[in-house]
From Swiss-Prot:
Record family assignment: Belongs to the MoeA family.
One CC-aspect GO term: cytosol
Keywords, in A-Z order: Magnesium, Metal-binding, Molybdenum, Molybdenum cofactor biosynthesis, Transferase
UniProt entry tagged with the keyword Metal-binding: yes
Record's protein name: Molybdopterin molybdenumtransferase
Cofactor note: Binds 1 Mg(2+) ion per subunit.
Catalytic activity: adenylyl-molybdopterin + molybdate = Mo-molybdopterin + AMP + H(+)
EC numbers: 2.10.1.1
Listed GO MF terms: metal ion binding; molybdopterin molybdotransferase activity
Pathway assigned to this chain's UniProt record: Cofactor biosynthesis; molybdopterin biosynthesis
Organism: Staphylococcus aureus (strain MRSA252)
Needed cofactors: Mg(2+)
Gene Ontology BP annotations: Mo-molybdopterin cofactor biosynthetic process
Amino acid sequence: MVVEKRNPIPVKEAIQRIVNQQSTMPAITVALEKSLNHILAEDIVATYDIPRFDKSPYDGFAIRSVDSQGASGQNRIEFKVIDHIGAGSVSDKLVGDHEAVRIMTGAQIPNGADAVVMFEQTIELEDTFTIRKPFSKNENISLKGEETTTGDVVLKKGQVINPGAIAVLATYGYAEVKVIKQPSVAVIATGSELLDVNDVLEDGKIRNSNGPMIRALAEKLGLEVGIYKTQQDDLDSGIQVVKEAMEKHDIVITTGGVSVGDFDYLPEIYKAVKAEVLFNKVAMRPGSVTTVAFADGKYLFGLSGNPSACFTGFELFVKPAVKHMCGALEVFPQIIKATLMEDFTKANPFTRFIRAKATLTSAGATVVPSGFNKSGAVVAIAHANCMVMLPGGSRGFKAGHTVDIILTESDAAEEELLL
């Protein structure tokens, strides 16, 4: 087999090549209660003002502000209570001179009133109360349309539907929501050295950990996942299973078979399915041999067979592709600053990603590597909630240095590619 020539490209360029492809999933309609974490397929426009009417944000008394002028501790002013309303009720009384309506939180302000006195600001008697301070017009009132007015875009196309967005959709009567269909993912682990999780260990063999990990990462994104039988290092069967997966799924992820060894067939498989290789080497560690191809609107990700490299490839490349396919406004990894809490002395000829544990406090973020950090390591992934990103050309970092980290357990993303 001829060894394929590979020229590494920067991580940022690799991500950009992925999202430059034209691949958008269709819009579908789902029930409101099923819409969580989907991407909106259209703008949601306010069809009425919020609040719909002037209302009270407190329990208290609705009064005319003019009647409170001159009130003080030495000159308490008395009001007569003429009605009592709760949320959902509307008073039919017109508030007159030194009159008041007892009002509960959320109730509509009665005609004539333009201020609300909270109960704790009064001394109550049987059907009267007194106050000791003046109130201004619209004091303690939530005004009609102060949050949003008719015609405002309240949710944007491409926005992730979170619990707050569901509240907005329910407010405007959306029992069904138009969203972008989420892509389905095929996961194919390759390698004659792999055993299934229930198999007895043999000399020279290891259990397949990448397949279950990638499945979990994809399902965490809410994606439908198809798991394919572990593939031996055989070109013909590899071509067949990738073709089958492409017929049924929008994304095909293979693990292993991307290096330059005698039994790494992925480049030949991509040729056989007529896929355009976007890149086949990235200037990073681990996962430099990560390969991504594109065919018929579908992504084919060739992730490393080494667990840490496989995990890194999913976080950096698969996640943005999924968000891009769903038309998300925010696609790219979110990067924050953190203080490194222990030395990392290894030189970094290329951008290095370290599985790590971040702690966020009021004083800022700190981070420490989560364990053994070679590309084949697996335990460190289980204890990580982020990846430290060390720039290429650096010669190690000391405790106390500020570093960039990507929060892998966070759903947050950026509109701009900051890597």
